Amino acid sequence: NEKSGSCPDMSMPIPPLGICKTLCNSDSGCPNVQKCCKNGCGFMTCTTPVP
């Protein structure tokens, strides 16, 4: 179940890099409105989406 919104563009990572380990497999594993997105390290973490 994908949540609404988009993952932030990681070519301009904010915050830089993020947590360098996988913390989720899908959006449904993330709390509230957060999505499972690839962070600047290339790992999947729960991230607040951009509209």
Curated annotation (Swiss-Prot):
The lineage of its organism: Eukaryota, Metazoa, Chordata, Craniata, Vertebrata. Keywords: Antibiotic, Antimicrobial, Disulfide bond, Secreted. One of its GO terms (molecular function) is peptidase inhibitor activity. Disulfide bonds join 7-37, 20-41, 24-36, 30-46. InterPro entries: Elafin-like_sf, WAP_dom. GO terms for biological process: defense response to bacterium; venom-mediated disruption of cell wall in another organism. This is Nawaprin. The keyword Disulfide bond applies. Residues 1-50 form the WAP domain. Belongs to the venom waprin family. The keyword Secreted applies. It comes from Naja nigricollis (Black-necked spitting cobra). Pfam families: WAP. Damages membranes of susceptible bacteria. Has no hemolytic activity. Not toxic to mice. Does not inhibit the proteinases elastase and cathepsin G. Expressed by the venom gland. It is found in: Secreted. GO terms for cellular component: extracellular region.
